[in-house]
Amino acid sequence: FGSRHHRARRDLNIASFAVAAMFNARKKIVKEKGAAPTELEEEVAKALFDIEVSPSSDIKADLRDIHISAAKEVDVGKTGKAVVVYFPFRVWKLVRKIQGRLIRELEKKFSKKHVVFVANRTILDKDFRRRGVKVRPRSRTLTAVHEAILEDVVGPTEIVGKRTRISVDGSKLLKIMLDSKDKDKENVEAKLATFAAVYKKLTNKEAAFMFPDA
C-alpha cells in the first residue's frame, strides 16, 4: 500500500508541475481581445518559457518581459514551412536586442523549420480621419509598414541595398541586398527563399533576397 501511495503522490506532483508549467508558459502569449491561442502558438509560448527558465540560457533576463501575440506557419515550397512569430510592438525593442540568439534557440526546438520574427504594426489607410486621427504618421502608412516588415523578416541580418526591377508586363520584383558579412551567420544563406516566401505572404509583394556578390 505504501509503495502505491508513494507512486500516486509522485504522479500527482508530476501532473501538478506540468499544469503549473503550462500556466506559466501561457503568460508568454497575449492574444487580442482574449482570443484562445492556437496549438502552434502554445508550442511557441512553451518554447519561450523553457528557454527563459533554462539554467544554461544567457538570454533569460531579456526574455522576462517578452511575450508573443501570434504565431503562424508559412509554406516556403521545397524547404517546407517556416514559423512566423508575431510580437507586440511595445516589446519589439527588447526582441531586437536578442533576435539572433532567440531565433537560434527556437529553431532548435522547431527542427527543420526556419523561424522569422515580425512586429505587430497597424496600417492607417487614406480614410484615417474617419477614425478620429488628424494626422497620419508616416510609420503607419502602407509603404512604411511594408518597409519595416522587410527589415523584420531578415533580422538580425542587415539590408545594404534595394532596387526594383519592372518587367515588360508591368510586374515588379524587389531585389534586396543583404550584408555579406552575415552570409555565413545564422544559416542566413539557406534562408533566402524563406525570406521571400514570408515577405510575399505578409505583403503580397514579390521580392528576391541575395548578397551583393550573387
Regions found by a protein language model. Name each.
Residues 1-7:
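Low-complexity, disordered terminal segments
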